[in-house]
């Protein structure tokens, strides 16, 4: 009997862990889908962040400021998933981190862990802190030039990292409500699984 109870509890705990992992993966996917628009809007920044241009163009800086004004999290997503094969990009992280300073746009990558809902002590969060320290030591690069290269075509994949529509991003109220509902649902799911364990422990 005791062995059966232990097995049931282990199964219930495993179900909760799986549910939480799936929920976390869904949250990251939502971040990627939400920021697909911003990646396309910052297409003119690619030559700079890939190390092919000495300075960003005015169009790049304009697109960056629109992103930071509408959703600061998206710059964090780009940096976090810089090595994602779905992006098909080779991004120089140091240049990407220096971009806000070069474009005279306010951005603080040390806030990325909070924006991405990361544990401050997790390896992913520490990456942002270490990158910020390295940026403070090296300093920003040159200011944007007046010349602008031709438009760059990007074909983001579904679930791709950071950006899908036209670069002019706006906050969509319906999306915010959906995210709020999702978080509430996740909380209720955790409570439900807690009571499942409680029931097994007390009544079985």
Curated annotation (Swiss-Prot):
Prosegment location in residue numbers: 177-204
Similarity annotation: Belongs to the plant LTP family.
Membrane topology field: Lipid-anchor; GPI-anchor
Residues carrying covalently attached carbohydrate according to the record: 92, 136, 164
Main location: membrane
Keyword vocabulary terms for this entry: Cell membrane, Disulfide bond, Glycoprotein, GPI-anchor, Lipoprotein, Membrane, Signal
Name of the protein in its database record: Non-specific lipid transfer protein GPI-anchored 14
PANTHER family found in the cross-reference section: BIFUNCTIONAL INHIBITOR/LIPID-TRANSFER PROTEIN/SEED STORAGE 2S ALBUMIN SUPERFAMILY PROTEIN-RELATED
Compositionally skewed regions (Low complexity) per UniProt: 139-163
Highest taxon in the source lineage: Eukaryota
InterPro entries in the record: Bifun_inhib/LTP/seed_sf, Bifunc_inhib/LTP/seed_store, LTSS, Plant_nsLTP
Residue numbers spanned by region Disordered: 139-173
Originating organism: Arabidopsis thaliana (Mouse-ear cress)
Annotated Gene3D superfamilies: Plant lipid-transfer and hydrophobic proteins
Residues linked to a lipid group, GPI-anchor amidated asparagine type: 176
Gene Ontology biological process terms in this record: leaf senescence; lipid transport; response to herbivore; response to insect
Tissue specificity of this protein: Vascular-specific expression in leaves, roots, stems and inflorescences.
